[in-house]
Regions:
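Aromatic "clamp/platform" in nucleotide-sugar-dependent glycosyltransferases that forms part
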Residues: 305
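Short hydrophobic beta-strand element within catalytic cores of glycosyltransferases
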Residues: 313, 322-325
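Short alpha-helical donor nucleotide-sugar binding micro-motif in glycosyltransferases
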Residues: 284-285, 292-297
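Nucleotide-activated donor-binding/catalytic signature segment of Leloir-type glycosyltransferases, i.e.
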Residues: 268-285
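Short His-centered aromatic/hydrophobic patch
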Residues: 116-121
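Conserved donor-binding/catalytic core segment of Leloir-type glycosyltransferases
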Residues: 5, 217-233, 239-243, 256
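Carbohydrate-associated surface elements
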Residues: 175, 195
Length: 394
């Protein structure tokens, strides 16, 4: 039987967004694959000195975890301050991380195909191909194309090499694919959309009422942001958007902010200065509670500076909420051109006005059938069949 290895390096301690996207890709592919699949997770571990300097929390070094009964080994790399300086300050190649990846190559000599996610795993897959002539594909999710390559000359060069060496590059949106072609040319590219878990669906009116009562928002409209409090998410605009909505809308409205990150304190301070504004900071929430949250809200807003294809907009639409956002990345591909706005001087007021329209009269905003894990798995499975059939090992 043919053997396929899947490599990814999303954070095991932050199981949302891209982590959940990869896990679902694996889960649905395993359900239909007629070939053997092994999955490997690469993780950074920051020693005490690195955590102190970077202000990051300690994480537990687990040996493995499970995806639907499939054991996934976790390979830990001890974060190096020297590597960080070389990569992000000097723009040159790492020493220890490069060695860590090179030492993994030999483990894959018996595989027929490598499916990698993002740059580091794509680099490892490229080295495996150079050593054993094993084909590989890379899936790109967002910041690995639109942000990270611009943070270091070496990362830019590495990303370009991986793009060109891959037998196929999958992008989660047409926008991300276009942005990748701005990095370089001469590589094979396809769009492979994220899907949505079956847990995200519209609840019955009675169940929605019960959940809203539990959350204390019965009889109110709810406008929500969900995501990381990072610069790329443009979260510092949220207080201004919320104030504008509150001034325009004549009924009761409350604002939810779900997530965490280094910009949270700044956003909290701005929200606290807004007299009369009703709001709630939820912090990070497990994925299991997000269907309840999205079934309790009326409108999700996402003012991002850039995106690949944000799962939260797909999930919110699947639960029956309306979504408004910036004209950034793959957001328009999901929510429609009439519900996105340029990040110009008029963005805050235009976004607030559209939110109020939706609060006053909910808009039909159906989720397109292409955002489906079954369809994604079918495309990926057919690719695996094609590439393993036409490729001959040396």
């Amino acid at each position: 039987m043919k053997k396929v290895a899947i490599l990814f390096n999303e954070s095991l301690n932050d199981r949302k967004g891209a982590f959940n996207a990869v896990v679902n890709r694996v889960r649905y592919l395993m359900q239909i694959a007629d070939f053997e699949i092994d999955v490997f997770l690469l993780q950074n571990y920051e020693p005490l000195l690195a955590r102190t300097l970077r202000g990051t929390p300690k994480v537990e070094k687990v040996k493995d975890f499970s995806i639907d009964g499939k054991t996934v080994p976790v390979w830990w790399y001890d974060f190096s301050i020297l590597d960080f300086i070389l990569l992000f300050k000097l723009g040159t190649s790492t020493v220890f991380y490069k060695r860590f990846l090179q030492n993994k190559v030999e483990r894959f000599r018996d595989y027929d195909l490598i499916l990698a996610h993002s740059t580091s795993c794509g680099y490892l897959a490229m080295k495996i191909k150079e050593r054993f002539a094993i084909p590989f594909a890379v899936s790109w999710h967002g910041s690995d194309i639109h942000t990270v390559p611009y943070q270091s000359r070496h990362i830019m060069k590495c990303t370009q090499r991986v793009l060109k060496a891959a037998d196929c590059n999958f992008f989660v949106s047409k926008s991300l694919k276009r942005q990748a072609h701005n990095l370089c040319s001469g590589f094979v590219s396809e769009v492979l959309y994220n899907g949505v878990s079956s847990a995200f669906h519209p609840y019955s009116p009675a169940e929605k009422m019960r959940i809203r009562e539990c959350f204390g928002v019965e009889g109110e409209k709810v406008v929500c942001f969900a995501g990381n409090f990072f610069d790329v998410k443009n979260v510092t605009l949220l207080p201004s958007i919320f104030r504008s909505v509150a001034s325009r809308y004549k009924g009761d409205v409350t604002f939810w902010l779900v997530g965490d990150g280094y910009r949270r304190k700044e956003v909290e301070a701005d929200m606290q200065s807004s007299v009369g504004l009703k709001y709630r900071f939820w912090g990070n929430q497990p994925s299991t509670i997000m269907p309840d949250i999205f079934n309790s809200i009326d409108v999700l807003v996402l003012p991002s500076k850039n995106e690949g294809l944000p799962l939260v907009v797909v999930e919110a639409l699947a639960c029956g909420a309306n979504v408004v956002g910036s004209k950034a990345g793959g957001i328009p591909e999901v929510i429609g051109a009439e519900n996105v706005f340029d990040l110009s001087d008029t963005f805050v007021e235009s976004t607030a006005a559209r939110i109020v329209e939706m609060l006053e009269a909910p808009v039909e905003q159906p989720l397109a059938e292409k955002f489906c894990w079954e369809k994604t798995a079918d495309v990926e499975c057919r690719f695996c069949h094609e590439i393993m059939k036409i490729t001959r090992r040396c």
